[in-house]
């Protein structure tokens, strides 16, 4: 579940619209676009309506959702599919957590952060996150805090084989 933002001409002026996309992958690995919705903003109510529409169209159960960091996703998913697991998109997490990292530190910080999200196991990832916090926590506390506070939805994929 994600959005693609684009400019459209409406009433002789350009405005930004979003196409909200839900891509599904079945147990055989086949990908299907389950729907595209045009809208103006994302909210829990919007995504809950989308998920309920998918249920109405025949989706009975969802094993795993991969989403960006919007809190509205989590709320809607937990309401519509309470047994589904959630994995936050690592790219979205990296972008949001490093947005205020100085250019002079970004390369070194990213090398250390990569050891967290590319670890082989959750235990290794947690150990690397502790090392990351020890090294960068005083300089970039919001970056470290973001990874710690979102760990439950950043580490979901460790439960599955690579």
Descriptions of predicted regions:
Residues 1-71, 75-83, 150-153:
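RNase H-like nuclease fold core
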Residues 16, 44-48, 67-74, 103-110, ...:
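Amphipathic alpha-helical transducer elements in NTP-driven molecular machines
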Residues 18, 63, 87, 96, ...:
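Structural beta-strand/beta-sheet cores of well-ordered domains, especially the beta-sheet scaffolds
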Residues 30, 90, 108, 152-160:
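Short acidic (Asp/Glu) and glycine-rich catalytic loops that position anionic groups and cofactors
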Residues 37-40, 63, 99, 115-118, ...:
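Hydrophobic alpha-helical scaffolding
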Residues 53-57, 79-83, 97-100, 104, ...:
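Conserved, well-folded catalytic cores of nucleic-acid-processing
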Residues 64-71, 76-114:
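Conserved beta-strand -> loop -> alpha-helix junction used to position metal-binding or nucleic-acid-contacting
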Residues 118-162:
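Acidic/histidine-rich catalytic cores and adjacent linkers
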């Amino acid at each position: 579940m994600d959005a693609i933002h684009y400019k459209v001409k409406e009433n002789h002026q350009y405005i930004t619209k979003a196409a909200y996309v839900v891509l599904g992958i079945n147990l055989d690995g086949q990908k299907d676009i389950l729907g595209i919705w045009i809208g103006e903003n994302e909210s829990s109510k919007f995504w809950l309506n989308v998920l309920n529409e998918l249920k109405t169209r025949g989706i009975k159960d969802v094993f795993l959702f991969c989403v960006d960091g919007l809190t509205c996703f989590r709320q809607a998913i937990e309401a519509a599919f309470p047994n589904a697991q959630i994995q936050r998109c690592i790219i979205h997490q990296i972008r949001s957590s490093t947005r205020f990292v100085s250019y002079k530190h970004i390369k070194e910080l990213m090398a250390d952060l990569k050891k967290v999200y590319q670890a082989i196991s959750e235990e290794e990832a947690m150990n690397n996150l502790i090392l990351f916090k020890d090294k960068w926590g005083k300089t970039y506390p919001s970056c470290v805090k973001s990874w710690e506070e979102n760990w439950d939805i950043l580490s979901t994929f460790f439960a599955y084989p690579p």
